[in-house]
Amino acid sequence: MADVKKVVLAYSGGLDTSVILKWLQDTYNCEVVTFTADLGQGEEVEPARAKAQALGVKEIYIDDLREEFVRDFVFPMFRANTVYEGEYLLGTSIARPLIAKRLIEIANETGADAISHGATGKGNDQVRFELGAYALKPGVKVIAPWREWDLLSREKLMDYAEKHAIPIERHGKKKSPYSMDANLLHISYEGGVLEDTWTEHEEDMWRWTKSPEAAPDTPTYIELTYRKGDIVAIDGKDMTPAQVLAELNRIGGENGIGRLDIVENRYVGMKSRGCYETPGGTIMLKAHRAIESITLDREVAHLKDELMPKYASLIYNGYWWSPERSMLQQMIDASQVNVNGVVRLKLYKGNVIVVGRKSDDSLFDANIATFEEDGGAYNQADAGGFIKLNALRMRIAAGKGRTQF
């Protein structure tokens, strides 16, 4: 890619991407535009501006994407009750398509002919960033330094930074032994002692949540109001999507909710252990299934459950911008038209317990479902014919001697 003139770099301001910035300038003799996204990671993003300026960057983008992230990516994903491999709520995966989108938008605005990212050659993020970029701008060039250079250790990165006078923080604060990634939906931890699948994670690793043992001894009750499958209010107070998730993170974290320790199957072929804190997302998943339980038709709910693993894999593997994900999303969104109402939850020492749900669009009919006298709302004698018709094929097979014993 010797003809690269301008590159948009996904820039955090940390050691890795600061080294990448200088490496791009030296290796490709190109202009670098930096893009730093505020996705609610809880860290100040403005210092990235000063670091980029110190490295000679003229065009610097620092964007607050929290509302767009939750409104256009997190909420649509939760309408599907999305879980990867039964447990993972896709906190990292769902952030990547937005970053890819913004990288391409900035490339178009600035006339850049390439984008670059700091994802390693071992992980899923390289796939997610690049699939998104190619889907949105087929001819874009992508530079992935971790697949090109020989700076394959933190020590080598530090040496490069010192040699090239790259500004890096040196202070007495203890650095986390884990590789961490955070946004408004979750915080992830990988590496360190977690690479031994038998070793228990350390309690002081967790940043957002109290341990269930240290959580309050009295439960916290909350009410979530839904409109078309999305939460619009907590305890009757209207909130924006980002405000909803931030508040649920706070409440959930106080009650020890949302910790996860899993070994997942990466798209690139390896197994990887990760620990995740997703307090707000854990609450949202439980509550959304509760409001759907009274507002969705049975077959619609079951079909959604059958399609969800495919939808989850598409997001995990980086296919958010694919036509098949878009097709599934349209179906999912159509199912949410009547998913309105209120869910009441009890949060207690790591548990999310549904204690009530109500909706003007509820399909629950107490007159039919009652165990008491129903006044003729349901004729129990009808069940006999229903059962016989559904047993017909099995009765015929049994009559031919095709029994199971």
UniProtKB/Swiss-Prot annotation:
Enzyme Commission number, as recorded: 6.3.4.5
GO biological process: argininosuccinate metabolic process; L-arginine biosynthetic process; urea cycle
GO MF, one example: argininosuccinate synthase activity
Chaperone found in the keyword field: no
Pathway: Amino-acid biosynthesis; L-arginine biosynthesis; L-arginine from L-ornithine and carbamoyl phosphate: step 2/3
Compartments (UniProt record): Cytoplasm
Binding site for ATP: 10-18, 37, 118
Family, similarity comment: Belongs to the argininosuccinate synthase family. Type 1 subfamily.
Protein name: Argininosuccinate synthase
